[in-house]
Curated annotation (Swiss-Prot):
Taxonomy, superkingdom: Bacteria
Keywords: ATP-binding, Carbohydrate metabolism, Kinase, Nucleotide-binding, Transferase
Protein name: Anhydro-N-acetylmuramic acid kinase
Family, per entry: Belongs to the anhydro-N-acetylmuramic acid kinase family.
Signal peptide: none
Organism annotation: Escherichia coli (strain K12)
Biological processes, Gene Ontology terms: 1,6-anhydro-N-acetyl-beta-muramic acid catabolic process; amino sugar metabolic process; peptidoglycan turnover
Activity response to pH changes: Optimum pH is 10-11. Inactive at pH 4.5.
Keyword Signal: no
Statement: the UniProt record of this protein carries the keyword tRNA-binding: no
Pathway involvement of the protein, from the record: Amino-sugar metabolism; 1,6-anhydro-N-acetylmuramate degradation; Cell wall biogenesis; peptidoglycan recycling
Enzyme Commission no: 2.7.1.170
Reactions listed under catalytic activity: 1,6-anhydro-N-acetyl-beta-muramate + ATP + H2O = N-acetyl-D-muramate 6-phosphate + ADP + H(+)
Pfam families: AnmK
Length: 369
């Protein structure tokens, strides 16, 4: 069974940077050693945002974007290796999620698309890459997401305490770790995505640092109720979503009914939308004793305060409290999934994704010997 140092690479729907994590992984433990966040150039970020919202690209433009993202991921890995004084031979493999540009797990021909050419990563780092983690699950009738609950269960499940792990990235997803029950998990809806999109358009900022804008505004209750009526929120699990659904166009359609509103009030309303949709799903799933939060949203003081207020019987903490950086959780999960793939072990949970069976995930792009 392959064990040793692995690197996880994650570029999420928030597009707030490329997260790269170095960890030692074997069948008994996952030990994080180092991490870094690598910036995404503004032009590349905008190109990804455009394609996620349905803007047409030529095949040439699409191919260029795929290559450029692969090169960006490789640069991020090489920066971490240099920082840690490591060589390619010191790493077993890289687990790279890729950049999701479209996720449509239902319909006539279910599919999901992550780009960032893994061949570029192998060529530029000299390290074997495991990528394309989601499509095997979809081929077996699953949603292809979320995949991280399997990792949450392996690291954070407790024999007697009802726990849930909440990842607030661009999309928020919940892992249900309830003793005596199959692991559950699904996307609750927008996490940081709409908040980030709004402040990017209104103030040119990548995100609302310390929720300054949101805390300066007031929740617009009619707008909140209008958004909460979206059918996704009442759809039963398994379910998953992404930027192709909850995007700036979605927000604009709701704002048409509310002309002239204060931008800070919209920011406050979007924060409340995220908090309310998450807390409702926690309660609908039977509640928990401890909610452990990770992802960029775990650094949002308003979101954390609202979750604690909406879930008075639950201890709301970050995963940092149990020794796992909330900023690095997803990248660490894909390093672990790469280890599972190389070990020939399944990486999905049918109870979470709805797939017909457990399966080994991903495609392996081997480095030259």
């Amino acid at each position: 069974m392959k064990s040793g140092r692995f690197i996880g690479v994650m570029s999420g729907t928030s597009l707030d940077g490329v997260d790269v994590v170095l960890a030692t992984i074997d069948e008994h433990r996952v030990a994080q050693l180092a991490s870094l966040s690598w910036p995404i150039p503004v032009s590349l970020k905008q190109a990804v945002l455009d394609i996620c919202q349905g803007q047409q690209l030529t095949l040439s433009q699409f191919g260029q974007l795929d290559t450029q993202l692969g090169q960006l991921f490789a640069d991020a890995v090489n920066a971490l290796l240099k920082e840690q004084n490591l060589q390619a031979r010191d790493i077993v493999a890289i687990g790279c999620h890729g950049q999701t540009v479209w996720h449509e797990p239902t319909g006539v021909a279910p599919h999901t698309l992550q780009i960032g050419d893994n061949n570029q990563i192998v060529a530029r780092t000299g390290i074997t890459v495991v990528g394309d983690f989601r499509r095997r699950d979809i081929a077996l009738g699953g949603q292809g997401a979320p995949l991280v609950p399997a990792f949450h269960h392996a690291l954070l499940a407790h024999p007697t305490e009802r726990r849930m792990v909440l990842n607030i990235g661009g999309i928020a997803n919940l892992s249900l770790l309830i003793p005596g029950q199959p692991v559950g998990g699904y996307d609750t809806g927008p996490g940081n995505m709409l908040m980030d999109a709004w402040i990017w358009r209104q103030a040119g900022k990548p995100y609302d640092k310390d929720a300054e804008w949101a805390r300066a505004g007031k929740v617009i209750l009619p707008l909140l109720q209008n958004m909460l009526s979206d059918p996704y929120f009442s759809q039963p699990a398994p379910k998953s979503t992404g930027r192709e659904y909850f995007n700036y166009g979605w927000l604009e359609r709701h704002l048409r009914h509310f002309p002239g509103v204060d931008p800070r009030d919209v920011q406050a309303t979007l924060a409340e939308l995220t908090a309310v949709t998450i807390s409702e799903q926690v309660l609908l799933s039977g509640g928990c004793e401890r909610l452990m939060v990770c992802g960029g949203g775990s650094r949002n003081p308003l979101l954390m305060a609202r979750l604690a207020a909406l879930l008075p019987g639950t201890e709301v903490t970050t995963t940092d409290a149990v020794g796992i950086s909330g900023d690095d959780m997803e990248a660490l999960a894909f390093a672990w999934l790469a280890w599972r793939t190389l070990a020939g072990l399944p990486g999905n949970l049918p109870s979470v994704t709805g797939a017909s069976q457990e399966t080994v995930l991903g495609a392996i792009f081997p480095a030259n010997p």
